[in-house]
UniProtKB/Swiss-Prot annotation:
Any Gene Ontology CC annotation: cytoplasm
Site (Transition state stabilizer): H19
Gene responsible for this protein: coaD
Protein name as it appears in the record: Phosphopantetheine adenylyltransferase
Catalysed transformations (reactions): (R)-4'-phosphopantetheine + ATP + H(+) = 3'-dephospho-CoA + diphosphate
Source organism of this protein record: Brachyspira hyodysenteriae (strain ATCC 49526 / WA1)
EC number: 2.7.7.3
PANTHER family xref list: PHOSPHOPANTETHEINE ADENYLYLTRANSFERASE
Binding-site list for substrate: T11, K43, V75, R89
Length: 162
């Protein structure tokens, strides 16, 4: 039996196989997964909001369980407005866990009715990060096996020097 709704927020700059792994595992557990492409004022994304949303759409196609949304404010406010009580985060290592525990405590303070769940990333993707992918691309390195195959050229094209 599946559960209700969950939100999976992130910058997804770019969308990786680690993100996809967590997303599909959430879709196996929940009836509805909102993947939230965040507007993060503390980061300067390589890809625009629309590019990031389109990347995810290209990978998942039409999927009744997964809805791609954009949040420019607090995720807890979006959760309240849409009656979402669970926020999910992927955890690669203890550094992620430390950061995410602090964030979950703050989110709980802002929205006491919510809970945060943590999914360990599959060991194949424990080292994958959007930052690492961008660093590899700066030196024209291969990103196959790090991002969905259908996105490799789209992502690489952003880094080709003109």
């Amino acid at each position: 039996m599946k559960n209700g709704k969950v939100i999976f927020p992130g910058t997804f700059d770019p969308f990786t196989l680690g993100h996809l792994d967590v997303l599909y595992r959430l879709a196996d557990i929940f009836n509805k997964v909102y993947i939230s492409v965040a507007v993060n004022l503390d980061k300067s994304p390589t890809f625009s909001i629309d590019e990031r949303k389109n990347m995810i759409k290209k990978v998942i196609g039409d999927n009744d369980t997964i809805e791609i949304v954009t949040i420019s404010g607090l995720v807890t406010e979006y959760m309240k407005q849409n009656d979402i009580k669970v926020l999910a985060r992927g955890i690669r290592d203890s550094e992620d866990l430390y950061y995410e525990l602090r964030m979950s405590r703050m989110n709980k303070l802002l929205y006491p009715e919510m809970d945060t769940i943590f999914l360990h990333t599959s060991e194949h993707y424990a080292y994958v990060s959007s930052s690492l992918i961008k660093e590899i691309l700066k030196f024209n390195g291969p990103i196959d096996g790090l991002v969905p195959e259908i996105l490799v050229e789209d992502i690489r094209s952003k880094f080709i020097k003109k």
